[in-house]
Each structure stands twice: as structure tokens, then as C-alpha cells.
Amino acid sequence: MQNRIEITEANLRNDRLVLTSEINDGAERKPAGRMLTDSDHFAFVYILEQDESFEYVILNEGIWSDLKAALDAGLPVFLHIGNTELELNGFHDELGYLIENIKDNANYGEEMEERVKRIFL
């Protein structure tokens, strides 16, 4: 998957979850409001639009407990990239859909299903 944005830190604050990337290129990005999974690398992926292409925010298993806490509390999720903070629109709906779809679904692989169940269910 090209155009990856790796998350280096996840911080729960009183009113939001902030995901941080080390990228500081000044590029303009827009949240696409869509997510997918990378079951080979045990990650959820949030899609951003940049010009006429896409970038993929990689949400590795190491931050899933923070994602679950934000999901349970209904906290908005933001991406801090460079000097910009973007709200990741549709995050809760998309993540919730993926979690429900992965549950008891061998199409994602047994290991992905087990890891998702362990954290989110």
C-alpha cells in the first residue's frame, strides 16, 4: 500500500483522540470518511484524499486500545499532521462497521478476527 501515513502516537484527551504522524510536508489533505482493513498487517486504514490521489492512515494494533476508548466514549478522532489537525469524519461509523463485519468472519483471516475480538469485543 503506497502513500502510507504511519501513526507514531495516539493521545486521548478530554474531548478527543489525537493521532500523530511525523509527516510535515504541508500538503493539503481531506478526510474521505472511509476506512478499510489491512488484515496482513493487522491494521485499520483511514483514507484521506490528496489532490487526485489517496493516502492511507495506518492504524496499527498498538493503538487499538486508544481507538476503542474513543469509540466507547464517542470522542471525535483527529489526525495531527504537520501544523494541521483534521477531524477524521465518519470514523466511528466506519470502524464500528468493520468491527462488526470482522466478527465471526473468516474472510479477514483467523488471526485478524481474534485480535479484533480481543480488543474491541
UniProtKB/Swiss-Prot annotation:
InterPro entries: UPF0738. Pfam families: UPF0738 (PF19785). Belongs to the UPF0738 family. This is UPF0738 protein BLi01253/BL05110.
